[in-house]
Curated annotation (Swiss-Prot):
Chromatin-binding factor that repress Notch signaling in the absence of Notch intracellular domain by acting as a CBF1 corepressor. Binds to the HEY promoter and might assist, along with NCOR2, RBPJ-mediated repression. May be involved in RNA metabolism. In concert with CIC and ATXN1L, involved in brain development. The modification Phosphoserine is found at residues 81, 87, 213, 229, 751. Belongs to the ATXN1 family. There is a cross-link at residues 16, 193, 585, 672, 721 (Glycyl lysine isopeptide (Lys-Gly) (interchain with G-Cter in SUMO)). It comes from Mus musculus (Mouse). The lineage of its organism: Eukaryota, Metazoa, Chordata, Craniata, Vertebrata. The modification Phosphothreonine is found at residue 218. Residues 516-742 are annotated as: RNA-binding. This is Ataxin-1. Keywords: Cytoplasm, DNA-binding, Isopeptide bond, Nucleus, Phosphoprotein, Repressor, RNA-binding, Transcription, Transcription regulation, Ubl conjugation. Ubiquitinated by UBE3A, leading to its degradation by the proteasome. The presence of poly-Gln repeats in trangenic models developed to replicate phenotypes of the spinocerebellar ataxia 1 disease (SCA1) impair ubiquitination and degradation, leading to accumulation of Atxn1 in neurons and subsequent toxicity. It holds the Pfam family AXH. InterPro entries: Ataxin-1_N, ATAXIN1-like, Ataxin_AXH_dom, Ataxin_AXH_dom_sf. It is found in: Cytoplasm; Nucleus. Residues 514-791 are annotated as: Interaction with USP7.
C-alpha cells in the first residue's frame, strides 16, 4: 500500500514530483546527501541530470519516465543542465525554490550540442555575498571556469579541455557568463560578489600564458565583483560578457572598496568568439617574460595586436571597484583588458598599483541625445575645462570605471568607415557616426604623488596628435616619463602600451605612462599609452606662400594636353607649349644680381626684363624654384628646395636666363610667369594668392577670360615674401609686361583675330632665343616699393 507521501507525489505535475532516495542510483545518492540544507536544491537539479535518463528509466520505469517528461517540460533548464552539471557545494547557504529560476535566467538556444556531464565539487570557500534571493541561482549556474581546479581531478580535465571548446560549447560558456553578469543589473545593491577558490585565475588561453606554480597559501580570498547598471537603465549588452578575473593583490585596488579580507575587482570582457580558461598563477620569472612579450607585441608600427591576443572582441566593459552605479544609461563602454602579474611579483615594499589601458567607446544602444546629456551631466571641472576651449566633448564614461577617479575622457571625431589598427572595421566597435572616446586620464584620488614626477596628461590622437599636460608642470616632456617607467625596475613588471587610432606614417610613437603612486594607499590607475606624433612640416605649412605644384611628383598639363611631372619639365616643353597655345608665350629675364634680404630666408634678385632690359628687383624665398633656359629648375638654395619639395634643382647664379609662359593678351601686357610648370598666370601671384587652379586652367588653354588685374598680380608677385634663405630654387616668376595694345585690351578671348596676329608676330623670332617683352613704367613702380626702376 502506498504511503501518503507517494500518493501526494503522484498528484503533483511531473516536474514537481520527487523521486525517492531509495530508487536512485548509488552515485546520485552520494551526491544528493551532502547535508540536509541542500535537500531542496538536490530535488530541483538532480532530476535533470543525464544520469537519471540513463539509469532511472531502466530501473524505475514509471518514475524515470515521468522524471524525463518533467525534464522536457523544463524548457529553460534543458540545455543548461545537460551541458554542465554541478553538485551543490558543501557550505550552507540560503537557497530559493526552483520555480524562481525561469524568471531569472533565459535559456540558451535549443538544440545546442552538449558536452559530457562532469561533477565538480565546489570548495568550502565558495560563498555568495549579497542578496539572498539571488544566491541560489548562482549555485546552479556557476560555469566550470569558476570551479577550483584542485577540488576534483575531473574538474582539472574539464579546465584543460576548455581551451579547445567548440563554438557550440563556447556559446554555453557565454550563456553562463551572461547569467552572472546580468544578475548584477537586477538590484541596486552594492553588487553581488562571487568568491572563487584561491587558485582561480582567468586569462586568455592559446599560448598567451603558461600554467605555473599555485599562489602562496596566504592568498585565500579572491573575488569576481560583478558591478553592472541597474535593470531600469534599459541598456542591453549585445555580446555576452565573460567575467575575467584580475589579480586581487591588496596594492592594486583602493582599500575603500574592500568588503572582505581582500580587494575585489572585475573585468567583464565580451568576446565574440573567444573563450577563457582557468589557469594557475604563473611564477615570477614566467610572469616577467610574459609581460615583456606582451609589451613587445603591443606596439607593432604603432598598432595594437589586440585581435591576436584577446580575440576579435566586439565590446568590452571594464568595471573596477565600487558598485555605486546610478539608474542612468551608460553611453560609454571601455574597450580594453588589464593584464596583471602574479602576486609573487609584488613584494611588501613594492606598492605600485597595476596599470592598465582603457579605451572608452560609445554604447551603440544609447541614443545620441542621451549621450549628449551624459556628457553634460558628467562634465568635470579641473582637467576638463582645459579642453573645453577647443570644443572637445568631455565627460565620465557613465560611472563605469569606478575605481579610476577622477578621470577625463576625450572625445575626438573618427570616421566610422575608417579601419582601426586592431584589424576590425570601425563599425565593429561603435555604431554609426558616433565618435569614440579614445583618451583617458587617470587622476588622483587622495594625496598621491607619481613616481618619477610624471605629469598627468591628455593625448588627443589625430593627424597631428596633441599632448596636453595636466598638473605637475615641473615636467614638460612626456618622453622622459616613458624613459623613467621603462628604466625603473619597480615598474618593469607591469608594462603596458595602448595605441588607439591609425596615424600617419611619419609619426613617432612615444608611449606615455602614468605611473602609479608609491604611497601605500595604491589605487588602480589607467595608464594612457597614446602615440605622440612628430609631424613633419610640409612645404605648405613651412611656407604657406609657396605653391604646392613645386612638390616633386606634381602633374603639369602642357598646352598640347600632355601630362608631365614637374621635375621632368624641359626647355622644349615651354617652347612647344608657346607654339601650340593661342594664349601663351615665352618670356625671359636675365638674373643680374642676387643679394640677401634683411628678412631671414629671403633673397633679393634683380632681373633685366625685356628688350630694353628694364631693371626689376624682387624679393623671393631662397627655396623658390626658377626654370633656367637650357638648365632646368634652379634656386638660390638648392638644398632647401630639395628638402621642402624634393625637387632636384641647380644653383641660380648671375647671368642665368629664366623663362616662363605668360598670357599674350593681358590689359597692360603679359605678366611673365616664372614658373613653366603652371600656366599662364604669374607664378608669384599664384604663390601669394594661391590661384593655382586658375593659372593651370589658362595654361591648359581653357577660355576663362583674361585677368584684367594682371598688373596687380605682377605687383604682388614682386612683393612675395618668402621666409627662406637665399639658395633655394625658385621657379621663374619674372614678370614681363609688353606694351599695352588696344586690340588686346578690347579682345579678351583667345579666339580674337587681333590676338592671332599678335601671336604670329611674336612667334617670328627664333625659338632658341625667347623674345623679350617690355615692362611699362607704371607696372614697375606698382611693385609696392620693392621694385627699383632702372635709370
Amino acid at each position: 500500500m502506498k504511503s501518503n507521501q507517494e500518493r501526494s507525489n503522484e498528484c503533483l505535475p511531473p516536474k514537481k514530483r520527487e523521486i525517492p532516495a531509495t530508487s536512485r542510483p548509488s552515485e546520485e545518492k552520494a551526491t544528493a546527501l551532502p547535508s540536509d540544507n541542500h535537500c531542496v536544491e538536490g530535488v530541483a537539479w538532480l532530476p535533470s541530470t543525464p544520469g537519471i535518463r540513463g539509469h532511472g528509466g531502466g530501473r524505475h520505469g514509471s518514475a524515470g519516465t515521468s522524471g524525463e517528461h518533467g525534464l522536457q517540460g523544463m524548457g529553460l533548464h534543458k540545455a543548461l543542465s545537460a551541458g554542465l552539471d554541478y553538485s551543490p557545494p558543501s557550505a550552507p547557504r540560503s537557497v530559493p525554490t526552483a520555480n524562481t529560476l525561469p524568471t531569472v535566467y533565459p535559456p540558451p538556444q535549443s538544440g545546442t550540442p552538449v558536452s559530457p556531464v562532469q561533477y565538480a565539487h565546489l570548495s568550502h570557500t565558495f560563498q555568495f555575498i549579497g542578496s539572498s534571493q539571488y544566491s541560489g541561482p548562482y549555485a546552479g549556474f556557476i560555469p566550470s571556469q569558476l570551479i577550483s581546479p584542485s577540488g576534483n581531478p575531473v574538474t582539472s580535465a574539464v579546465a584543460s579541455a576548455a581551451g579547445a571548446t567548440t563554438p557550440s560549447q563556447r556559446s554555453q560558456l557565454e550563456a553562463y557568463s551572461t547569467l552572472l553578469a546580468n544578475m548584477g543589473s537586477l538590484s541596486q545593491a552594492p553588487g553581488h560578489k562571487v568568491e572563487p577558490p584561491p587558485q582561480q585565475h582567468l586569462s586568455r588561453a592559446a599560448g598567451l600564458v603558461n600554467p605555473g606554480s599555485p599562489p602562496p597559501p596566504t592568498q585565500q580570498n579572491q573575488y569576481i565583483h560583478i558591478s553592472s547598471s541597474p535593470q531600469s537603465s534599459g541598456r542591453a549588452t549585445s555580446p555576452p560578457p565573460i567575467p575575467v578575473h584580475l589579480h586581487p593583490h591588496q596594492t592594486m585596488i583602493p582599500h575603500t572598496l574592500t568588503l572582505g579580507p581582500s580587494s575585489q575587482v572585475v573585468v567583464q570582457y565580451s568576446d565574440a568568439g573567444g573563450h577563457f580558461v582557468p589557469r594557475e598563477s604563473t611564477k615570477k620569472a614566467e610572469s616577467s617574460r610574459l609581460q615583456q612579450a606582451m609589451q613587445a607585441k603591443e606596439v607593432l608600427n604603432g598598432e595594437m595586436e589586440k585581435s591576436r591576443r584577446y580575440g576579435a572582441s566586439s565590446s568590452v566593459e571594464l568595471s573596477l571597484g565600487k558598485a555605486s552605479s546610478k539608474s542612468v544609461p551608460h553611453p560609454y563602454e571601455s574597450r580594453h583588458v588589464v593584464v596583471h602579474p602574479s602576486p609573487a611579483d609584488y613584494s611588501s615594499r613594492d606598492t605600485s598599483g597595476v596599470r592598465g589601458s582603457v579605451m572608452v567607446l560609445p554604447n551603440s544602444s544609447t541614443p545620441s541625445a542621451d549621450l549628449e546629456a551624459q556628457q553634460t551631466t558628467h562634465r568635470e571641472a579641473s582637467p576638463s575645462t582645459l579642453n573645453d576651449k577647443s570644443g572637445l566633448h568631455l565627460g565620465k564614461p557613465g560611472h563605469r570605471s569606478y575605481a579610476l577617479s577622477p578621470h577625463t575622457v576625450i572625445q575626438t571625431t573618427h570616421s566610422a568607415s575608417e579601419p582601426l589598427p586592431v584589424g576590425l572595421p570601425a563599425t565593429a566597435f561603435y555604431a554609426g557616426t558616433q565618435p569614440p572616446v579614445i583618451g583617458y586620464l587617470s587622476g588622483q584620488q587622495q594625496a598621491i604623488t607619481y613616481a618619477g614626477g610624471l605629469p598627468q596628461h591628455l593625448v588627443i590622437p589625430g593627424n597631428q596628435p596633441l599632448l596636453i599636460p595636466v598638473g605637475s608642470p615641473d615636467m614638460d616632456t612626456p618622453g622622459a616619463a616613458s624613459a623613467i617607467v621603462t628604466s625603473s625596475p619597480q615598474f618593469a613588471a607591469v608594462p603596458h602600451t595602448f595605441v588607439t587610432t591609425a596615424l600617419p606614417k611619419s609619426e613617432n610613437f612615444n608611449p606615455e605612462a602614468l605611473v602609479t603612486q608609491a604611497a601605500y594607499p595604491a589605487m588602480v590607475q589607467a595608464q594612457i599609452h597614446l602615440p605622440v606624433v612628430q609631424s613633419v612640416a610640409s612645404p605648405t605649412t613651412a611656407s604657406p606662400t609657396l605653391p604646392p605644384y613645386f612638390m616633386k611628383g606634381s602633374i603639369i598639363q602642357l598646352a598640347n594636353g600632355e601630362l608631365k611631372k614637374v621635375e621632368d619639365l624641359k626647355t622644349e616643353d615651354f617652347i612647344q607649349s608657346a607654339e601650340i597655345s593661342n594664349d601663351l608665350k615665352i618670356d625671359s629675364s636675365t638674373v643680374e644680381r642676387i643679394e640677401e634680404s634683411h628678412s631671414p630666408g629671403v633673397a633679393v634678385i634683380q632681373f633685366a626684363v625685356g628688350e630694353h632690359r628694364a631693371q626689376v628687383s624682387v624679393e623671393v624665398l631662397v627655396e623658390y624654384p626658377f626654370f633656367v633656359f637650357g638648365q632646368g629648375w634652379s634656386s638660390c638654395c638648392p638644398e632647401r628646395t630639395s628638402q621642402l619639395f624634393d625637387l632636384p634643382c641647380s644653383k641660380l647664379s648671375v647671368g642665368d636666363v629664366c623663362i616662363s609662359l605668360t598670357l599674350k593678351n593681358l590689359k597692360n601686357g603679359s605678366v611673365k610667369k616664372g614658373q613653366p610648370v603652371d600656366p599662364a598666370s604669374v607664378l608669384l601671384k599664384q604663390a601669394k594668392t594661391d590661384s593655382l587652379a586658375g593659372s593651370r586652367h589658362r595654361y591648359a588653354e581653357q577660355e576663362n577670360g583674361i585677368n584684367q588685374g594682371s598688373a596687380q598680380v605682377l605687383s604682388e608677385n614682386g612683393e612675395l615674401k618668402f621666409p627662406e634663405k637665399i639658395g633655394l630654387p625658385a621657379a621663374p616668376f619674372l614678370s614681363k609686361i609688353e606694351p599695352s595694345k588696344p586690340t588686346a585690351t578690347r579682345k579678351r578671348r583667345w579666339s580674337a583675330p587681333e590676338t592671332r596676329k599678335l601671336e604670329k608676330s611674336e612667334d617670328e623670332p627664333p625659338l632658341t632665343l625667347p623674345k623679350p617683352s617690355l615692362i611699362p613704367q607704371e607696372v614697375k613702380i606698382c611693385i609696392e616699393g620693392r621694385s627699383n626702376v632702372g635709370k
